[in-house]
Amino acid sequence: MKVTYLGHACVNIDIDGTHFLVDPFISPNPLASHIDINSIKADYILITHAHGDHIADVGAIAKRTGAQLITNPEILAHYEKLGLTGHAMNLGGSHRFVDGKVKIKMIKAEHSSSFPDGSYGGNPAGFLIDYNDDIIYISGDTALHYDMKIIPHQYKVNLAIFPIGNNYTMGVRDALTAARFVEVNNVLGVHYDTFPVIKIDKEAAKRKFKDDHRRLHLLEIGASLDLKDLNISTL
């Protein structure tokens, strides 16, 4: 499972050649101006919620690639009216994709969800992606919440993808607590530095995780990490 960071909260997860694109917000993001959205591969597009900074490029990429959307019923209904197709899920539900090889579970996020025009975007969510018992937890935009402690009772998460920019979501301190709740040692930070209000001190953030014997990965936009290269034990 190879994870490529495409800026803000967008990642592209390559699972043996099948691409799961998450929350594409690339073309409006000046920090990602070097990323060509016309070259992005996508078989599925996961949408955590309806805010504009998570859906800006959904239509363009899905129309070009034929990607299936995976999201809540309200967001899927919105895009079906625009001619796109996909699979609707709701909180607590799971479904298998790619001929049953990839299991995705939709889980709780504490946030809001409305489209840029103010229309209802359903419940915000996160996703657990399970492939051969390698598991990535994408929290989506969220506050720290105690339900995260349920996750390690059922799953051994290899990598968590957490927002760390504060103001709209968890900041670094809460993301570290979330890592403790989930019992995960490797965290990929997202949703930071895109706007002035969510700028962070990256070195201080990494030190905070290191002091807790965990690793915070802050990738350059366009860079990747592979689960097989991570040390899943205590760092």
Feature roles, as predicted:
Residues Q68, E80-F97, L176, R180-L235:
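Binuclear metal-ion centers of metallo-dependent hydrolases, dominated by the metallo-beta-lactamase
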Residues M1-H19, I26-N29, K101-K103, A204-D212, ...:
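Zn-dependent metallo-beta-lactamase
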Residues H34-S113:
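Active-site HxH/HxHxD metal-binding segment of metal-dependent hydrolases
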Residues S114-F181:
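Active-site-proximal loop/helix segments of hydrolase catalytic cores
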Residues P28-N29, G52-A56, L76-Y79, G93-F97, ...:
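Active-site environment of divalent metal-dependent phosphoester hydrolases
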Residues L21-D23, A42-A50, I70-P73, Y137-T142, ...:
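Active-site neighborhood of phospho(di)ester-bond hydrolases with catalytic His/Asp-centered motifs
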Residues N12-H51, A56-K63, S112-G118, T142-Q154:
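Pre-active-site segment of Zn-dependent metallo-hydrolases
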Residues M1, K63-Q68, D134-I136:
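Short active-site oxyanion
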